[in-house]
Swiss-Prot record:
Cofactors that this protein relies on: prenylated FMN; Mn(2+)
Active-site residues from the entry: 290 (proton donor)
Disulfide bonds: none
Recorded superkingdom: Bacteria
Record membrane topology: Peripheral membrane protein
Binding positions (prenylated FMN): 178-180, 192-194, 197-198
Root EC class: lyase
UniProt: Mn(2+) binding residues: 175, 241
Organism: Yersinia pestis
Free-text function comment from the UniProt entry: Catalyzes the decarboxylation of 3-octaprenyl-4-hydroxy benzoate to 2-octaprenylphenol, an intermediate step in ubiquinone biosynthesis.
InterPro entries in alphabetical order: UbiD, UbiD-like_C, UbiD-like_N, UbiD_bacteria, UbiD_Rift_dom
Full protein name: 3-octaprenyl-4-hydroxybenzoate carboxy-lyase
Amino acid sequence: MISMKYRDLRDFLSLLEQRGELKRISQPIDPYLEMTEIADRTLRAGGPALLFENPKGYSMPVLCNLFGTAKRVAMGMGQEDVSALRDVGKLLAFLKEPDPPKGFRDLFDKLPKFKQVLNMPTKRLNSAPCQEQVWQGEDVDLSRIPVMHCWPEDAAPLVSWGLTITRGPHKERQNLGIYRQQVLGKNKLIMRWLSHRGGALDYQEWCEAHPGERFPVAVALGADPATILAAVTPVPDTLSEYAFAGLLRGHKTEVVKCLSNDLEVPASAEIVLEGYIEQGDMAPEGPYGDHTGYYNEIDNFPVFTVTHITQRQDAIYHSTYTGRPPDEPAVMGVALNEVFVPILQKQFPEIVDFYLPPEGCSYRLAVVTIKKQYAGHAKRVMMGIWSFLRQFMYTKFVIVCDDDINARDWNDVIWAITTRMDPSRDTVLIENTPIDYLDFASPVSGLGSKMGLDATNKWPAETPREWGRPIKMDEDVRARIDALWDELAIFSDKDAKR
C-alpha cells in the first residue's frame, strides 16, 4: 500500500519543496489577519503549502495550507494520488471487520494485510527531538508562539491544529483528536471538544472515576502528517491512531513520554504543550469564524492549564484557518471521502459511491448511490449512514440515488431529485438528534433534525403509478452519427476550442 515514506513533518516539507508544493514567504507577514488572507487566496487557487518564515513580532516560522489540496492529503497518507486512498479505506474496512481465511490459498492472499497490521506497533524513545527545549512553571508563555488571529471578530488567537492526546481511566490506548483551542492567557487555553468526541469522553470518565483530580492532557503541534490524518480518520476503536499512522507513513510511529505525566506524544512533533484540566474549570469560548462561513456563538468549555512547553530546536508552528468552503477541512473532506467509501461498502455492499460535497461544509450533506434491491431500500441506507460511523453523526442531509446517477455531478443529482422524488412521500425527517453545536440553524444548541431524500426510482410497492423510463437514443443511430460527425463540420475549429 505504501508508495512514499517520510519520517516527520520536516521530512515531508522537504518532499513537498522538491515537488514545487511548498512556497517559502520571506516577507514579514502578520499572524493577525494577514496570514489568513494570503492562505485563503492561495488555497482557493489550488496553490502550495505556505511557510511564513518571518511572522511579524515572532522568530518562529508558521506553516499554513499543509493539506490545502487533495493531492497533499494523499501524500500525507503515504500515497501518490487521491484515488489510491481507496486502498487505505479497504485496509481500514478489513481492520474493522477482518474476514477469516476461507482456506489455505485465501490465507496466503490475506498475509500481506496481516503483515501490515503486525508492523504497526509504536516505538518508544527515552529522549526525543520534541523535548530539545523545555519551559516550565513561570517560564511557560504561549505568547512566544505565533498563534494566528484569523478573522476580525474572533475572540482571541486560536490554536487550530492541536493534536490533543488523552487517556481515559479504564483504557490502555490513548485517544488522539484535533480540537481548536482559544488562547486565554500565558499558560491557559480553552479546550473546545464536543461531548461525543474521544477526548471529551475520556475527560468525563476521568471525572467519574477520580472526582476532584486533575485530568492530564498533552497537545502536539506540528506532528507528522500521518499522525495528524490518523486522528481524523475512522480508525477502529481497537486500533491506536499512532499505530495506524505508522502504517501510513511506512515505519513505526516514534513516541516519548511527557515530562509531567504518563501520556505519550509524537517524538518528532515541533511543539508539545503539557498540562491538565482542573475539574469544573470552564470558560466561555468564542466567537470564532468557522468552517460554516459564519461566526459561531459563545459556549463554555474546559480550561487547559499548560505546565510545560517542550519543542524542537528552530521549531515550526503548524496552523490553519477555517471559513466558508473551500477551506482546509473541506479539502481534507474531499480526500478522506475516498477512505470512507470502502468502509461503507463493507457494511452496505449495495453502495456504489458516496460523496461529501465540499460546499456542504465537509460533512453536512452526503450523496449516496446504490444498487437498489427492494422497496424502502433508500431509507435503510440513510439510517445506516447516520449511525455507522461517528464522522456522520452530524450529517444533516443524505440524498440517495440509483447507480445510474453520478453522485459527484450536481446536474445528475438535481435531475434525480426533481424527477424521482415526491416531497411528501420521499422525504424522511428525524427530529431531536445530535447536531453540531456550531450549527446555529438548529432550534437548540447541539440538538436538531436531519433530512433524508429518496431520489431513487420507485418500485411497485412504493407507487401505484407507472414509472417513467429514461429517454435513450438508439445505439445504431449513435454509432452512425459518430462516424459522420466530423464530416458534418457543425462547429468551427474556433467553436471546438471554445
